[in-house]
A protein has these predicted regions:
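Short, amphipathic alpha-helical segments that act as regulatory/interfacial helices
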Residues: 79, 175-177
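Predominantly extracellular beta-rich ligand-binding scaffolds that present long acidic/polar faces
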Residues: 1-137, 150, 182-183
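Active-site and glycan-interaction determinants of carbohydrate-active enzymes
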Residues: 126-173, 180-182
């Protein structure tokens, strides 16, 4: 789902959690605040991407994507731009780059084909919605792992648009499955 809102609360973020939360295959990007603020409770986050959430309006490597004081964190197999170092997330998660061309830069489908879209790929003031499905070159592709979820209620077999996961192997990280891969698993040369 797409969510838009304004907040001046002290714990502002794209998603503010005050209780236990279990999230799988979420795409939380390009918000004018940290992506998640886990104020209290337990946060279980899997196969999700948090990138480009910034309080300054300019994406920078030091922008914190997850913040808060949750009582328990289980954050595995995600692609995250930055998080507090004391959370020690980098052994089980991918740390994304903000530098275009870097292998860990999360390339998304370019929405400039829409009328009124701009080259940043995020703002479409006169046209259709931005498309945040990963491109085939993105590190998010075939990087998901449903086996770590451990909860049948969170296990998914399709993305937010209905495309089946695991096209070409493992599912992609995030809410969208890349559609550039051949859905039947064979290559046709012409």
């Amino acid at each position: 789902n797409t969510n838009t809102g304004l907040s001046s609360e002290s714990f502002y973020s794209a998603i503010t959690l005050t209780n236990d939360a279990r999230l799988n295959h979420c795409t939380i990007i390009h918000n004018n605040a940290p992506g998640i603020c886990a104020v209290d409770g337990q946060l279980r986050l899997y196969n999700s991407v948090l990138w480009g959430n910034t309080s300054t309006g300019i994406i920078a490597p030091e922008d914190v994507q997850i913040t808060g004081s949750a009582t328990m964190l289980d954050i595995r197999n995600n692609a995250i731009q930055n998080a507090p170092e004391e959370w020690n997330l980098w052994s089980e998660n991918m740390q994304l780059s903000v530098v275009q061309g870097d292998p860990l830069y999360p390339a998304f489908v370019n929405p400039t084909r829409n009328v009124g879209a701009v080259s940043s790929g995020y703002d479409t003031p006169l046209g259709g919605p931005a498309r945040f499905e990963p491109t085939c070159e993105s590190p998010l592709v075939i990087a998901g792992d449903e086996s770590i979820v451990g909860d049948p209620d969170l296990a998914l077999d399709a993305d937010i648009t209905g495309h089946n996961f695991a096209v070409g192997g493992a599912p992609d990280i995030g809410a969208y499955e890349a559609t550039c891969l051949n859905p039947v698993g064979s290559v046709l040369y012409v």
